[in-house]
């Protein structure tokens, strides 16, 4: 009896293993709009030679004609069959989204169940925000997050580059922003707050922080563009701007004693120097980020 039960258990385990020994569309996150499977699986090659892409196919164009324009641009149909993989899309961006769905299945297993996937985005803006002011991570971390966004078929990364806790972007016209307020004492915001908001410099052994050079940003933007992801920079204003007042107290508002208040959290809208500062900063930011939007906080 024990032997029979053991054999039955082994048979069950073999059955379960065989069922899960290949990947399928239900493993894709987020779930595609439509997907179906059929018997059989295809062993995906590693060089991409078995993936054929067809752009602006008339039949596919008719299929997506009723979708919003942004959805048409990113829509795709992915077909896995005995002869390989076919991708139909209107644009290179749509084909890229299809490849990411294929990659997500491949990460589970190279054996992909025969399937047909039709997918398009339901939302035009799909992304995350990285708070680089309070928690600076650096270029390689940002690129890793871009890869994760691409795999999830997202299309926006919001970089929160400035806040009271540190300025994170090279601005040639205002070097104090990176020389004096890109580094602080206290790794976490609460540690820094508890110490009285001290800033320091890169040579301090207790320094935490850093900033992105313009070349860093150009590299990040190019890396994101290859993955069809836009980078939205955030330059916080007029609040959450104590770091600016600490770096350039001459544009801070003055107190009743007639002296600047560098610990003020807000930019001084009554000081003409504030507007000169913002205009100059934004000119340099616009040169780095070739997109429609710049975020100013909220």
Where are these regions (language model features)?
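Feature activates predominantly on carbohydrate-active enzymes
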Residues: 71-277, 281-295
């Amino acid at each position: 009896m024990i032997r029979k039960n053991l054999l039955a258990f082994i048979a069950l385990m073999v059955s379960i293993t065989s069922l899960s020994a290949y990947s399928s569309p239900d493993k894709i996150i987020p779930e595609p709009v439509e997907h179906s499977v059929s018997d059989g699986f295809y062993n995906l090659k590693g060089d991409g030679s078995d993936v054929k892409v067809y752009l602006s196919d008339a039949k596919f164009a008719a299929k997506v004609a009723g979708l919003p324009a942004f959805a048409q641009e990113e829509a795709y149909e992915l077909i896995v069959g005995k002869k390989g993989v076919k991708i139909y899309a209107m644009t290179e961006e749509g084909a890229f989204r299809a490849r990411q769905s294929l990659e997500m299945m491949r990460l589970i297993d190279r054996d992909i169940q025969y399937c047909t996937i039709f997918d398009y985005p339901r939302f035009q803006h799909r992304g995350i925000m990285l708070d680089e002011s309070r928690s600076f991570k650096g270029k390689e971390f940002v690129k890793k997050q871009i890869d994760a966004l691409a795999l999830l078929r997202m299309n926006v990364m919001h970089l929160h580059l400035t806040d009271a806790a540190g300025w994170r972007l090279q601005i040639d016209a205002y070097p104090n922003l990176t020389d004096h307020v890109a580094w602080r004492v206290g790794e976490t915001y609460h540690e820094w707050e508890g110490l009285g908001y001290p800033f320091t410099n890169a040579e301090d052994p207790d320094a935490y922080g850093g900033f992105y050079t313009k070349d860093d940003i150009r590299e990040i933007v190019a890396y994101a563009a290859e993955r069809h992801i836009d980078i939205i920079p955030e330059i916080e204003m007029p609040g959450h701007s104590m770091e600016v007042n600490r770096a350039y107290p001459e544009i801070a508002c003055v107190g009743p004693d007639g002296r600047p208040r560098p610990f003020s959290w807000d930019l001084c809208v009554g000081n003409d120097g504030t507007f000169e500062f913002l205009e100059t900063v934004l000119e340099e930011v616009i040169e780095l980020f070739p997109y429609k939007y710049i975020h100013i906080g909220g």
